[in-house]
């Protein structure tokens, strides 16, 4: 009996140790629909937590917990970098997105989200689609990134790609002293929703591209697109993209692509792309700096989609989204300059900026002004 009690206490201690940086972790279980989900709220200093919901057949609950804790913390930094009044959150549904989905499952998930009373807003991520969240919307108002037909801003890959292009302009300026996108060659990994749009825009500017993707149709399409532009496209094997000679490596597919194995192969001057968590560890950021490779922090350069979904809660306004997305240029350039000034990596400079912004904004958000409600309460009316 004593042994059982001791084990339980130790398990509780381990769980709280894992979530020591987080405000709240919610385990959601609905046996009728098969829903097993975890919602993690990292920090709400800037406002309610915001983050997508992914569905994945995790091997264990612990694996799912590790993922949602890591991703939600990353969202706190991403929201701070994008200067939106939201904190970091994330949700994961444990299950196979090909076989385990149902309208009832997402309605059940929506009910759990609604039970948080506006502390958490969510939308699509890996393994989930907007069709899934149309069902969740029947149970909660805290869904963002909805289709235009349902009052949302539409395809978030458009501002995401635009933000990457602004980041590439800033990177070109830092490398060559001018923003001209045609001035550089680019090795693009991934021609998905975002990567393809980035490649199209670069071709229109007349840039030289080296591309790879597992989808042969996407490769054929971008080659056909190149024929009507002054740019050029060369298709390379998936693993060869790391050793491809180019000015800028543009990862637009997987996370963790900058690691011990790939970092020695790189033959580029800079890395700037839309993929999340490009550095396997922060140490790899330091290794890039030692090699003289400029790195655009992923959560700054790919923030265009976040800017759009956060802006929905003011009411859809595409011009406002475009104006905010354009600021990614200044944010990337400032990060480069600050890192150089302080003798630190660009990722360390970005993290410092975000942490300072959260601390400074925290004082304003906790200063009571009488009749003026907190911003995030007002937004519940949209």
From Swiss-Prot:
Reaction it catalyzes: L-phenylalanine + NAD(+) + H2O = 3-phenylpyruvate + NH4(+) + NADH + H(+)
EC number: 1.4.1.20
Binding residues annotated for NAD(+), in chain numbering: 54, 125, 156, 160, 190-196, 213-214, 253-254, 274-276
Matching CDD domains: NAD_bind_Leu_Phe_Val_DH
UniProt keyword Oxidoreductase, yes or no: yes
GO BP annotations, alphabetical order: amino acid metabolic process
UniProt xrefs under InterPro entries: Aminoacid_DH-like_N_sf, Glu/Leu/Phe/Val/Trp_DH, Glu/Leu/Phe/Val/Trp_DH_C, Glu/Leu/Phe/Val/Trp_DH_dimer, Glu/Leu/Phe/Val_DH_AS, Glu/Phe/Leu/Val/Trp_DH_bac/arc, NAD(P)-bd_dom_sf
Temperature profile: Optimum temperature is 52 degrees Celsius for amination. Exhibits prominent thermal stability, specifically a half-life of 23 days at 30 degrees Celsius and pH 8.5.
Residues engaged in binding L-phenylalanine: 78, 276
TM regions (residue ranges): none
Active-site residue numbers: 90 (proton donor/acceptor)
GO MF annotation: an example: nucleotide binding
Record key words, sorted: NAD, Nucleotide-binding, Oxidoreductase
Biotechnological and industrial applications of this entry: Shows high catalytic efficiency and thermostability, and is a promising biocatalyst for the industrial production of bulky aromatic primary amines.
Regulation of activity: Activity is not affected by the metal chelating agent EDTA. Addition of 1 mM Mg(2+) results in 15% increase in activity, while the enzyme is strongly inhibited by 1 mM Fe(3+), Fe(2+), Cu(2+), Zn(2+) and Ag(+).
Description of pH dependence: Optimum pH is 9.2 and 10.8 for amination and deamination, respectively.
Similarity comment: family membership: Belongs to the Glu/Leu/Phe/Val dehydrogenases family.
Annotated function: Catalyzes the reversible NAD(+)-dependent oxidative deamination of L-phenylalanine to phenylpyruvate. Can also catalyze the oxidative deamination of several other amino acids, with much lower efficiency. Shows activity towards various bulky aromatic alpha-keto acids/esters and (S)-amine alcohols. Can catalyze the amination of 3-(2-chlorophenyl)-2-oxopropionic acid (CPOA) to produce 2-chloro-L-phenylalanine (2-Cl-Phe), a chemical compound used in the pharmaceutical and biotechnology industries. Shows a preference for amination over deamination.
Protein name: Phenylalanine dehydrogenase
Species of the source: Bacillus thermotolerans
């Amino acid at each position: 009996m004593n042994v059982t009690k001791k084990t339980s206490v130790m398990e509780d201690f381990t769980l709280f140790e894992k979530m020591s940086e987080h405000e709240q972790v919610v385990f959601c279980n609905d046996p009728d629909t098969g829903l097993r989900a975890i919602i993690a709220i990292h920090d709400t200093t800037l406002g309610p937590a915001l983050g997508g919901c992914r569905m994945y057949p995790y091997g264990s609950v612990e694996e799912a917990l590790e993922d949602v804790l890591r991703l939600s913390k990353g969202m706190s930094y991403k929201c701070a970098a994008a200067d939106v009044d939201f904190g970091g959150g994330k949700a994961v549904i444990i299950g196979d997105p090909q076989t385990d989905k149902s309208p009832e499952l997402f309605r059940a998930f929506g009910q759990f989200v609604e039970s948080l009373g506006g502390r958490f807003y969510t939308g699509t991520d890996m393994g989930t689609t907007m069709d899934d969240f149309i069902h969740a919307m029947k149970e909660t108002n805290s869904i963002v990134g909805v289709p235009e037909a349902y009052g949302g801003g539409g395809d978030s890959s458009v501002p995401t790609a635009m933000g990457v292009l602004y980041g590439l302009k800033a990177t070109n300026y830092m490398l060559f002293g001018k923003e001209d996108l045609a001035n550089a060659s680019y090795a693009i990994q991934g021609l998905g929703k975002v990567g393809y749009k980035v490649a199209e825009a670069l071709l229109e500017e007349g840039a030289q591209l080296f591309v790879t993707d597992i989808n042969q149709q996407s490769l054929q399409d971008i080659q056909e697109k190149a024929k009507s532009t002054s740019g050029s496209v060369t298709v390379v094997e998936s693993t060869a993209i790391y050793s491809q000679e180019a000015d800028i490596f543009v990862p637009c597919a997987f996370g963790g692509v900058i690691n011990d194995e790939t970092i020695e192969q790189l033959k580029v001057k800079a890395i700037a792309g839309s993929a999340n968590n490009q550095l396997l560890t922060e140490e790899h950021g330091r290794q890039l700096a030692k090699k003289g490779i400029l790195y655009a922090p992923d959560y700054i350069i790919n923030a265009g989609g976040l800017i759009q979904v956060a802006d929905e809660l003011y009411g859809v306004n595409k011009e406002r989204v475009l104006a905010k997305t354009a600021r990614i240029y200044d944010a990337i350039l400032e990060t480069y300059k600050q890192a150089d000034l302080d003798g630190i990596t660009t990722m360390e400079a970005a993290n410092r900026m975000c942490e300072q912004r959260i601390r400074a904004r925290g004082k304003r958000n906790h200063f009571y002004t009488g009749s003026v409600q907190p911003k995030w309460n007002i937004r519940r009316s949209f």
